[in-house]
Amino acid sequence: MSAEPARGYRNTVIAAACLGLVWLGDALIYVVLPLYPAAFGVDITTIAILLSVNRVIRIVGYGWVSPLARKFGANTLTAAACVAGALSTLAYGLLSGFALLFIARLMWGAAYGVINLTNTAYAYGDGRRAGMHVGLNRAVSTMGPVLALGLGGWLVTSVGPRWVFVIYGLAGLLAVPLALTLPRLRHSGSEVPARSVERWKVNPHNVLFFVVALGADGVFTATLSTLLADLIPVTSALIGAGLLLASQRLLSVILSAVGGPLVDRFQAGRLLVPCSLVIAAGLVLIALGHVYAGAVILIVARVIFAIVGPIIAAQQSEDRIGAIAAYSTWSDVGLAAGAFLGIMGMEWAGYPATYATLSAMTAAATLWFKLRAVPPPAHA
């Protein structure tokens, strides 16, 4: 109790604020670009590429974050990424055409990859009350997209679909001086750099991270509107879509803030397996036609898993950023694959078979993790 105030929440909140500020443009581009392609000088057929290429580049770049953070300091690296992220948002408003926007999306993908990893490293810190810190970090950072989407529709109707990104880009530049106030985080407890984590190593942890992201993130997100199409009237209103997405983000904020202390109370290692099994249960409920119940269970369990997962990953090595990079790599690959496989699975096999298969895969990966996972090293 007496040692905890020495750490405090300063770094956790500042790092989260940096991500939230530069996240504004990316959150809104998914709503605005499909509705106003001509305003950005792009064809409707290229929108999918622009909205997905950022995920590809961040997967490729995760491996560079840990060595660069050791060399230059995590705060300097975060500040540089904030510059790139803010400039990418400004580019949405000031540039046009597929080629230039493609470069801007590549910049954002690289920037997000850096800030996402350093954010979690700052939140994890020395491991004390990691659940509370990671949950708070995610809650604060997600307020950026909540505000971007909540205000975005009104701003677009007021200043137009391009100038809104200039406003958001200028706001993102505020993250740069904030990032420089963070500590360097060169090493994690010793002057000797920790052994680099093998990002692509197939082990029970990484497979479970992949499978959960595949089903609960990728497939679920890509197919939810199709699942609900017969139950909820579809609206294309810009403000309505923005507020709907903002409400989903706000729910994530609340659940992250509440879930963090729960993770500390019950310990991350004890929650990973039950949380994964609950996700499997949510998937099978959707397969059986209980879409509402399954969706609620998935959303809640996935938020808790998003807190538990990086904590478990960080405990595996003194190279915190490298370990979190491995977690993010497998999660992002699952997310990207799920977005594709979900649509194809719905088309070829229908949603009952698709979701039943995902449930079985999640249960199997959880069982493998339970039987084969090794405990974290003593220093973690």
What role is predicted for each listed range?
Residues V31-T45, A222-G240:
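Short amphipathic helix-loop junctions that connect adjacent transmembrane helices
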Residues I49-S66, L243-V258:
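Central cavity-lining transmembrane alpha-helices of secondary-active solute carriers
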Residues T76-L90, G169, R270-L285:
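Structural signature of the two symmetry-related core transmembrane helices
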Residues L106-S141:
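Cytoplasmic helix-loop-helix junction between adjacent transmembrane helices
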Residues V114-G127, I304-E318:
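Intracellular juxtamembrane helix-capping segments at the cytosolic ends
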